[in-house]
Design a protein with these regions (language model features):
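Short alpha-helix in the alpha/beta-hydrolase fold that links the catalytic acid
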Residues: 150, 164-173
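Conserved alpha/beta-hydrolase
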Residues: 12-34
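Catalytic active-site module of serine/aspartate enzymes centered on a nucleophile-bearing elbow/loop
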Residues: 195-212
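Alpha/beta-hydrolase active-site loop
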Residues: 38-59
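Acidic catalytic loop of the alpha/beta-hydrolase fold
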Residues: 158-163, 190-191
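Catalytic histidine neighborhood in serine/cysteine hydrolases
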Residues: 172-190, 203
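Short beta-strand/loop motif that positions the catalytic acidic residue
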Residues: 147-149, 154-156, 160
Length: 212
């Protein structure tokens, strides 16, 4: 299970150096957050929209809001792109997100675990429908991005052994809003910032300045 100190410990310094007001969130079913089950972005996208509304209730709507996430967090913020964000929602930064629960389960089963996903697919989907009332492929980042209205920056490492970079390419091509892509040669899953810190920061800052 992920936690924000583990996932954002390094990049947090970059955000604070650039005077960002940051809400660090642990998704449902993670550590101290409520909820028994992860929705792999399907349910968390609605939580994400609630977090934006919470920030606006605390700080007003004058500040631009950027949604950022890594891995399942990236999938969550990308799926949120399909919802009606407040007017101060300025953009999304998604680092190595997958396209849907079903797609990543299939990839991990076949490519990482080397097991057939055929029957397991039906079992996994049935459990998903029972626990979160949605099927594993009922919604995807591709669906969301076709309706995206805010700019999106996609980030992925070429050597990602968990989420294939092809999923980010698929997301990028589906995105209907202004989009940018940072590909980091040699970076494994979630390691792009650590491997190309200066390039990562430079491109994120440029993205912020362009769309703030």
């Amino acid at each position: 299970r992920a936690s924000w100190p583990a996932d954002f410990g390094m990049v947090a310094d970059f955000w604070h150096r650039n005077n960002c007001t940051v809400l660090y969130a642990e998704q449902r079913g993670q550590n101290n957050s409520d909820g028994e089950y992860m929705g792999f972005g399907l349910t968390e996208r609605f939580d994400c929209l609630d977090w934006v509304k919470y920030m606006n209730s605390r700080f007003g709507t004058a500040l631009p809001v950027w949604l950022c996430g890594v891995s399942m967090g990236a999938t969550t913020v990308l799926m949120t792109a399909g919802l009606d964000l407040p007017e101060n929602g300025h953009g999304i930064i998604a680092d190595c997100g997958f396209t849907s629960p079903g797609a990543i389960w299939k990839h991990v089963a076949e490519k990482n675990l080397h097991i057939s996903y055929g029957l397991r697919s039906a079992v996994a989907d049935a459990m998903c429908r029972r626990k979160i009332l949605m099927g594993a492929d009922d919604y995807s980042t591709v669906d969301a991005l076709r309706a995206a209205k805010v700019p999106v920056m996609f980030i992925h490492g070429t050597d990602d052994r968990f989420v294939p970079i092809s999923m980010t390419y698929e997301n990028y091509l589906a995105c209907a809003s202004p989009r940018e892509l940072l590909v980091v040669p040699g970076a494994d899953h979630g390691m792009s910032y650590y491997l190309e810190k200066e390039k990562y920061e430079e491109q994120v800052l440029d993205f912020w300045h362009k769309y703030s």
